[in-house]
Amino acid sequence: LISEKESRYEREYSSHLYSESEKSAINIKEVYPKYSNETKLVDGREIINKYFFELFENNPKVFAVGEDVGMIGGVNQGFAGIQEKFGKYRITDTGIRESSIIGQGIGSALRGLRPIVEIQYLDYVYWALQTLSDDLSTLQYRTRGGQKAPVIIRTRGHRLEGIWHSGSPMGTLINSLRGIHILVPRNFVESVGMYNTLLSSDEPGIIIEPLNSYRLKENLPTNLSEIKVEFGCPSILREGSDISIVTYGSMCKIVMDSAEQLQAVGISCEVIDVRTLLPFDKNDTILNSLKKTNRIVFADEDVSGGASAYMMQNVLEKQNGYYFLDSKPITIHSKDHRPAYSLSLIHISEPTRPG
């Protein structure tokens, strides 16, 4: 009887936090990037810029607003040349008012448009948190799916550029914004796939582009407009047998470099990129890795008790991963203070690879 009541109340009072329609982002399947024999190696910023040109050309409902996105093409040039080609009504500079930027996105999305609203750096999301939390993340829930505002919030963060430009407050976002997809790409091909998935859905999401990857080289796919990332499906970046290391975003490169160093001394690491924090690992990919290695580390750039603790709870408690442990699970995270500006001192504040 108790079980039946719990099931009924779950449906009555906990439904519609996320979309339950056929266009729910969770239903959209992976479409992998394709490469030709003449594939170019380009900066990450060139990939996202080329994608935005194709997107604005092909989808007249898409427009963008944010600080410096128009005239100068964004602080990292992702929108370079877009305003010149498509005009000020399609991509518009705003004042320094993050809450207002989000509000513009909510209103236009409710009217059927597909806004990309830019918060210049992840640290500045705090100034829009009340609007994101009270208005956007609750919209489908409090209207029982009756209203939808599929806003895409574009921002950047994690490593680089000191106290105000390199924050990684992922725990804050995870705990405040249930109802919004929290997406943490490791590179710009992944970012493109996440934009396409959101644009194919009827839900909002926040994409946190890796700040230190705009000038890192990537292969340019031939099918940018088609790539999709399946939310809740981690990627195994490196197979191993001794320990599972779970991470995301900018930390993927750090962990991969560290795994290479550990391999040299006989330690085989399996490296897993979660890709999306909300939703998190819907197919138990991390649990299956833990069953093989029996040891696990969760690594990120948030403070202690942040996203690393969230990932640990999901794997050990919700997926019952504790049963397969042969040693204590570990979290690797940043210090509880803000990061230093000097790159030579970043190892004091944030996780870095040895050497």
Model-derived regions: residue spans:
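Thiamine diphosphate
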Residues: 3-213
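Glycine-/acidic-rich phosphate or pyrophosphate-binding loops and their flanking alpha/beta elements
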Residues: 47-55, 168, 189-205, 213-264, ...
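Short helix-loop-beta junction
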Residues: 81-88, 172-177, 254-272
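Short helix-capping segments at alpha-helix termini
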Residues: 143, 262-267, 318-325
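Generic long, charged, amphipathic alpha-helical segments
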Residues: 268-289
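Catalytic-face loop-and-helix region of soluble metabolic enzyme cores
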Residues: 300, 308-331
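Single conserved hydrophobic/aromatic residue that forms the stacking wall/gate
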Residues: 346-355
